[in-house]
Amino acid sequence: MAQGSHQIDFQVLHDLRQKFPEVPEVVVSRCMLQNNNNLDACCAVLSQESTRYLYGEGDLNFSDESGISGLRNHMTSLNLDLQSQNVYHHGREGSRVNGSRTLTHSVSDGQLHGGQSNNELFQQEPQTAPAQVPQGFNVFGMPSTSGASNSTPHLGFHLGSKGTSNLSQQTPRFNPIMVTLAPNIQTGRSTPTSLHIHGVPPPVLNSPQGNSIYIRPYITTPSGTARQTQQHSGWVSQFNPMNPQQAYQPSQPGPWTTYPASNPLPHTSTQQPNQQGHQTSHVYMPISSPTTPQPPTIHSSGSSQSSAHSQYNIQNISTGPRKNQIEIKLEPPQRNSSSKLRSSGPRTASTSSLVNSQTLNRNQPTVYIAASPPNTDEMISRSQPKVYISANATAGDEQGMRNQPTLFISTNSGPSAASRNMSGQVSMGPAFIHHHPPKSRVLGGNSATSPRVVVTQPNTKYTFKITVSPNKPPAVSPGVVSPTFELTNLLNHPDHYVETENIQHLTDPALAHVDRISEARKLSMGSDDAAYTQALLVHQKARMERLQRELEMQKKKLDKLKSEVNEMENNLTRRRLKRSNSISQIPSLEEMQQLRSCNRQLQIDIDCLTKEIDLFQARGPHFNPSAIHNFYDNIGFVGPVPPKPKDQRSTIKAPKTQDAEDEEGAQWNCTACTFLNHPALIRCEQCEMPRHF
């Protein structure tokens, strides 16, 4: 890799400049020449040098103008690294946290181990947490000799400074706004659940860099003495509008850093909006219960200004629902349709100190949230605009807010409000944020009103909008959005969704031009569980559509089966009807008896007719069948037979009878009984029928 002891490897120089942007280029080049372009050795040396330049202790008197011009542009990126989720694990690991997003190396991580870098395990995200130096200030936040005396105070990431004799070097590069959260905030329905900070300086013109969130936790040592963790003293949630990746804190803690197991550090995330210059950042701040102890904040007075920094463990919010949390957002002021802020109540029973601010160049307020505000001497020594959050207010403040819990910001005007440091920075009176629980409530909590926030800080250069909402869905009005606590509501609200919260805020004329920035912003989810919920919803919607298509197919199949069943039932009904009709055509028993008698009578008639036909054929044409029915009239007649009348027929028959008698042997058949009689008999021997009737 090295090209010689007298040459500089520009690739190594570029890597080191990105890893240590606060170190001047000439120092990095000199370090590379001394270490023969060895990356590990340069990282070890520059990690120590970076602390000096980061805290304003480096040598700024360079005779080389090219070095000075390079220094003005050296803060090009602040990078992050991920840390293990184990509370008591102190080493930097390569496992993914916060939604499996890889974080790059931080300026406070110390030495970068080349063989154990996360870049070998995961894809490196763009190391872009840019910062621009405003006009009239050098790269360390101090006014330049040629700059205007009334330039804007340089606000940013306060890291503290080591004690030196020079007051200008003691002045930190960034003027933070301190927000202290008192430990006695009551949890419940009226617990403040969201903190909106409205009012950030605009970005530098034509600046490709975005905003950053500088977060610094503080904690007091048990002995009362404070010290500064040099290379592990802070973490930054950085954001670049040109790269939509998100970077998460924290940096690698030192082995001496305390890890309160009950106080997990809140989760911080950033969001990439559609338009440049509309960057927002969100921090979820756990609120402690009344019984949970919380480490207070100490800001030591005097010239040392050293403080103990505690690096807490990150708790992955995606492991459960977001409960018991306060979300803080810092954004430009006077925005009608600002980006949406969603948060909920405290997630854990403990309080974690955190800081959230959004950087738009170097002029950004920094919010410090700790257990208690510093004393007056410490505030005078810092001489910076500060905001402290506590749960108590003065008696005068409580008189007007007895019916609603209020998170109140008041100004503590004192000697620090009028003091100026040697750098020309105007120190502003600190503002205190107090939480007012309601004085009167109906049993059962039905009459609990929504908590309010009052912000009064007349000397500050920035405008704050802080919204505190209870655990219930808010109403709708123009202003800053308060959270609703269902994940479905988080995803379904449109971009223009707003709430009805009485938000009292200060307007700053110096920041009025921020309104020219576009008002369109995306819905800020604020944590990885919302992204997971969004992906889950997409998956569930796709599954629902697939199931709906299957349901339609099943419905069609069911309709087809129903039609087939109806047709089969109709066929069965027709067959049954036909069968019933055929049964009805069969005659009954009485009808069959009648038909049988009719058939018998017809048979008798047929036989009679047949006999009559035979008789008619045998007797000739003069056969009279009616005379047969009268031959019984002569039976039993006594007396002589009357003589027949003499007529021609009788005369004709006489010779025939004579001829028959002459034959004596010709027998005759009786016409009635067909008995064969002797020819001499004139009557039938059986029926007495006359022979010639």
From Swiss-Prot:
What Pfam families does the database record attribute to this sequence? CUE
Q: Which GO terms describe its cellular component?
A: cytosol; endosome membrane; lysosomal membrane; nucleoplasm
Question: For the region Disordered, what residue ranges are annotated?
Answer: 90-171, 223-310, 330-380, 640-663
Which InterPro entries does its entry note?
CUE, TAB2/3_CUE, Znf_RanBP2, Znf_RanBP2_sf
Identify the keywords attached in UniProt to this record, alphabetized: Coiled coil, Cytoplasm, Endosome, Isopeptide bond, Lysosome, Membrane, Metal-binding, Methylation, Nucleus, Phosphoprotein, Ubl conjugation, Zinc, Zinc-finger
Give yes or no: UniProt keyword Ubl conjugation: yes
Coiled-coil annotated spans: 532-619
User: Which GO terms fall under molecular function for this chain's record?
Assistant: K63-linked polyubiquitin modification-dependent protein binding; molecular adaptor activity; ubiquitin binding; zinc ion binding
- Describe the effect of Q686 to I/M: Confers ability to bind monoubiquitin and polyubiquitin, irrespective of the type of linkage
Q: Phosphoserine occurs at which residues?
A: S372, S450, S482, S524, S582
Give every CUE domain span.
Answer: 8-51
Tissue-by-tissue expression: Widely expressed.
What is the topology of this protein in the membrane according to its UniProt annotation? Peripheral membrane protein
Does the keyword section mention Zinc-finger?
Answer: yes
Please state where this protein is localized: Membrane; Endosome membrane; Lysosome membrane; Cytoplasm, Cytosol
Record comment regarding domains: The RanBP2-type zinc finger (NZF) mediates binding to two consecutive 'Lys-63'-linked ubiquitins.
The record describes its quaternary structure and partners as: Interacts with MAP3K7 and TRAF6. Identified in the TRIKA2 complex composed of MAP3K7, TAB1 and TAB2. Binds 'Lys-63'-linked polyubiquitin chains. Interacts with NCOR1 and HDAC3 to form a ternary complex. Interacts (via C-terminal) with NUMBL (via PTB domain). Interacts (via the C-terminus) with DYNC2I2 (via WD domains). Interacts with RBCK1. Interacts with TRIM5. Interacts with TRIM38 (via B30.2/SPRY domain), leading to its translocation to lysosomes and degradation. Interacts with ASB1; this interaction promotes TAB2 stability.
Describe the task this protein carries out: Adapter required to activate the JNK and NF-kappa-B signaling pathways through the specific recognition of 'Lys-63'-linked polyubiquitin chains by its RanBP2-type zinc finger (NZF). Acts as an adapter linking MAP3K7/TAK1 and TRAF6 to 'Lys-63'-linked polyubiquitin chains.
Designated name of the protein: TGF-beta-activated kinase 1 and MAP3K7-binding protein 2
Species per Swiss-Prot/TrEMBL record = Mus musculus (Mouse)
